């Protein structure tokens, strides 16, 4: 098998309503979510199976996609489909409470876990980059990261600006599937933003979906707009078509002072995701095929200049942070020895949430009916009545976020809350309040499901940044708990060799059996995050574990000795 069958001039959309294509909702759900990942409203390049994040794909090639669809259509509720890097490799008899699909994407033996070896396998058709939610079939468009980015900006505002970002502006780059969330997140947090993107098509997509408000005609126009809006205290997002490796150094030379600096280009993948300065996108794609080593070097050289500019802002005292694309590592590889002087966003702003199992809980309406999402929004408010911040997020999301593909919602909630919400949603399906089942999943970027020393597990207080037993245990436990599909990936977010991570999705079809699975999965999944952080010695996590009654033998022993 080769990688050649990766283009098909077609459009895919998931079925809507209650008519089944597969044999049950347990198999209809992964089928619809696979197709939803490739909906033109959702995916970055669906005709080549690319969902987001450089070359993050939903299936290895179109032949594999067709066989996955065929397998899911005929799969029984006591069988499990195995997916190996986007290729359906087996169907096995299991049982009704086992996952219907088990997915392993992009995993390599550590010595060979690098882009060079992966790209060789990719060209031969032996591997597929699954990113995080591309190959695990639970991507919901840019909304999937909006709240996490919003929470980051809000916390940065608390730490650096007295709790308000009014009249402030964020400098960043990248308007792809993940980076496209930044302008809207900044606006929702009360800040202006200047968002640099080298592909006009991506700017057009974000303008169309209302994730970005305006496009500047050129560099000077962008700065003039920023000055106008910040002076008026307005939160407006501005896109600028250009190369960050050229624009950020120029801003430094001019003495321009943003209030916050970050980046979400696809720097994790220098061959496919970061345009070298001075190159056109067409040249970049052409030479990636004929001169991959030269292209990687050129991209990383530009990243080094990009990071040098970020360091200059950092040394000016401007809050500057990596937003999880591994650009600091790429720059360090090119000789920028102090690349890690500015922090990643997780240790800087998010880790206290992870210690309580709080993370990106998401759900999608298989009916295709937006009213089902609005009803679940109301249920979240009803069941979590005192969280004004969460209510504000849900109100803003309804007002500002356009659904992409099947209607979906994300909100950050933690241990105890997730199971409560899942069971309530299942009951809403049972009573007919929702018109069809829903699926509940999450990003792999979560409390207990990832090992990524340059992102989610950066600067762990016990030094366990690179220990990847935790996402493996998370995947095993979600499988044992009865998630509908479970995934285990390598390289998402930060690229080959730098992360391992797992995901899960559970279906709410209104049945008693589903309720039992939901209760197990949506408790155990965030509980592994509390466990992981408690094991690392975080007091917030230890206290949460005690409050939630988690049985963590070594934590109990440690606390007993302290007493």
Curated annotation (Swiss-Prot):
Active site annotation, chain numbering: 411
Keywords for the protein's UniProt record, in alphabetical order: Cytoplasm, Histidine metabolism, Lyase, NAD
Matching InterPro entries: Urocanase, Urocanase-like, Urocanase_C, Urocanase_central_sf, Urocanase_CS, Urocanase_N, Urocanase_Rossmann-like, Urocanase_sf
Enzyme Commission number, as recorded: 4.2.1.49
Gene Ontology CC entries for this record: cytoplasm
Principal place of residence: cytoplasm
Coiled coil feature spans: none
Residues that, per the record, bind NAD(+): 53-54, 131, 177-179, 197, 202, 243-244, 264-268, 274-275, 323, 493
PROSITE patterns from the UniProt entry: UROCANASE
Subcellular compartments: Cytoplasm
UniProt cofactor(s): NAD(+)
Cofactor binding comment, as recorded: Binds 1 NAD(+) per subunit.
Keyword Lyase: yes
Gene Ontology terms, MF aspect: urocanate hydratase activity
Pathway, per record: Amino-acid degradation; L-histidine degradation into L-glutamate; N-formimidoyl-L-glutamate from L-histidine: step 2/3
Gene3D superfamilies: Urocanase like domains, Urocanase superfamily
Catalytic activity as recorded in UniProt: 4-imidazolone-5-propanoate = trans-urocanate + H2O
GO terms for biological process, alphabetical: L-histidine catabolic process to glutamate and formamide; L-histidine catabolic process to glutamate and formate
HAMAP family membership: HutU
PANTHER family, alphabetized: UROCANATE HYDRATASE
Main function: Catalyzes the conversion of urocanate to 4-imidazolone-5-propionate.
Family to which this protein belongs: Belongs to the urocanase family.
Name of protein: Urocanate hydratase
Annotated organism of origin: Yersinia enterocolitica serotype O:8 / biotype 1B (strain NCTC 13174 / 8081)
Gene name of the encoded protein: hutU
């Amino acid at each position: 098998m080769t990688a050649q069958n990766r283009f098909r001039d077609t459009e895919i959309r998931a079925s809507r309503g209650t008519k089944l294509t597969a044999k049950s909702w347990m198999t209809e759900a992964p089928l619809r979510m696979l197709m939803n990942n490739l909906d033109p409203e959702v995916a970055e390049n669906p005709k080549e199976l690319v969902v987001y994040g450089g070359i993050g794909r939903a299936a290895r090639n179109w032949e594999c996609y067709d066989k996955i669809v065929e397998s899911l259509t005929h799969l029984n509720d006591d069988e499990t489909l195995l997916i190996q890097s986007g290729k359906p490799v087996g169907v096995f008899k299991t049982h009704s409470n086992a996952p219907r699909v088990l997915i392993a994407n992009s995993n390599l033996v550590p010595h060979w876990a690098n882009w060079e070896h992966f790209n060789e396998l990719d060209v031969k058709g032996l591997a597929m980059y699954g990113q995080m939610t591309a190959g695990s079939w639970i991507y919901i468009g840019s909304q999937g990261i909006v709240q996490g980015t919003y929470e980051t900006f809000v916390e940065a505002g608390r730490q650096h600006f007295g709790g308000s970002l009014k009249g402030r502006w964020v400098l960043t780059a990248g308007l792809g599937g993940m980076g496209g969330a930044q302008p809207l997140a900044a606006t929702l947090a009360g800040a202006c933003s200047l968002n640099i993107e080298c592909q006009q098509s991506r700017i057009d997509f974000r303008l169309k979906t209302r994730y970005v408000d305006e496009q500047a005609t050129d560099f000077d126009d962008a700065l003039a707009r920023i000055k106008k809006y910040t002076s008026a205290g307005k939160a407006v997002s501005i896109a600028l078509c250009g190369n960050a490796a050229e624009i950020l150094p120029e801003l430094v030379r001019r003495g321009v002072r943003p209030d916050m600096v970050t980046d979400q280009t696809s720097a994790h993948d220098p061959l496919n995701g970061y345009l070298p300065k001075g190159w056109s996108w067409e040249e970049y794609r052409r030479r990636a095929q004929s001169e991959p080593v030269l292209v990687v070097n050129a991209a990383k050289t530009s990243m080094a200049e990009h990071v040098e500019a970020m360091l200059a802002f950092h040394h000016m005292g401007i809050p500057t942070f990596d937003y999880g694309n591994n650009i600091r590592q790429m720059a360090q590889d090119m000789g920028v020895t102090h690349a890690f002087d500015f922090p990643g966003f997780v240790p800087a702003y998010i880790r206290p949430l992870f210690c309580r199992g709080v993370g990106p809980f998401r759900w999608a309406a298989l009916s295709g009916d937006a009213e089902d999402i609005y009803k679940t929004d109301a249920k979240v408010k009803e069941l979590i009545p005192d969280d004004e911040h969460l209510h504000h997020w849900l109100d803003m999301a309804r007002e500002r976020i356009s659904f992409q593909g099947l209607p979906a919602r994300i909100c950050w909630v933690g241990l105890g809350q997730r199971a409560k919400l899942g069971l309530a949603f299942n009951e809403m399906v049972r009573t007919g309040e929702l018109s069809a089942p829903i699926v509940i999943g999450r990003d792999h970027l979560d409390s207990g499901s990832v090992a990524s020393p340059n992102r989610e597990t950066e600067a762990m207080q016990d030094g366990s940044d690179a220990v990847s037993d935790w996402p493996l245990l998370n995947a095993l436990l979600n499988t044992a708990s009865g998630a509908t599909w479970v995934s285990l990936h390598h390289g998402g977010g930060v690229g080959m060799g730098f992360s391992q991570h797992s995901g899960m999705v559970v279906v709410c079809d209104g049945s008693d059996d589903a309720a039992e699975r939901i209760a197990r999965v949506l408790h155990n999944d965030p509980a592994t995050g509390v466990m992981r952080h408690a094991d690392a010695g975080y007091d917030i996590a230890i206290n949460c574990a005690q409050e939630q009654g988690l049985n963590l033998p070594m934590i109990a022993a440690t606390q007993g000795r302290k007493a």
